């Protein structure tokens, strides 16, 4: 069977859900699952193989090591270290200190990797930057703002009582408390709807807490955001994803247009208020990055 090869690092809630999604839609010819929890990854692979047969998926699923990821066209990093998150604000940043060393260690092992790396591990804007700086990989994207944008469009579609595909709009900045909805450029059927868009912002901010209260951790939404991004980074379809990428001296979410797998920023015009909000998010992320544990080794300049 020919087709792309995708690696998934992490067999927790998001890794499991993503892997099941990859198998069900048969996006890749091979799926390589890597985790430090050997027994867990063996069980997950067996479960996915059963699923693949049941749904007649062409995807071959196997357990692997980090070295096997070099043979993948794309790698999704969904690892999460063991820690207790007691944060009541900036919840996604709660794992920064715990997750940064693990991201750095993986990045060192993947130095020179030439495929696309999609980072899901939170706080994603900080972790994507850490992975890119330590590994030197050129195609690193953080997953988060595209999930925020999907939620935004869904809530606005419900509010306006239209199908979601009639809504156009972006959420940029931090995947977290300082996300910036681009109200001024949001449209329904091509017409501006800034007033109605403003009405759903509170619901957008509350949605992650609603999910956590019900199932403990978001998993399906992030997995869907990864699947959508993989299709574009692998050049299977063209389109736009809001992804965390370099923005000045920080990383944060902006719209990226993919054509044949080639990315190009396509941020909409911003009002003065939206620009100030984006600058505030950048400043906060800049400060937060300085608080991360220093990587033990960086890639040579």
Q: Would you name each region that the model predicts?
A:
Residues 32-72:
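Conserved N-terminal Rossmann-fold NAD(P) cofactor-binding segment
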Residues 58-94:
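NAD(P)H-binding glycine-rich loop region in Rossmannoid oxidoreductase-like domains
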Residues 13, 36-39, 97-101, 126, ...:
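Conserved active-site and cofactor/substrate-binding residues in soluble primary-metabolism enzymes
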Residues 161-301:
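Long, compositionally biased stretches enriched for glycine and/or charged residues
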Residues 1-44:
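NAD(P)+-binding Rossmann beta1-loop-alpha1 motif at the extreme N-terminus of oxidoreductases
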Residues 5, 73-74, 116:
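Structural motif
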Residues 23-25, 49-53, 129-139, 157-162:
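Short, surface-exposed basic-aromatic patches at helix termini and helix-loop junctions that form
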Residues 90-153:
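Rossmann-like NAD(P)(H) cofactor-binding subdomain of soluble oxidoreductases
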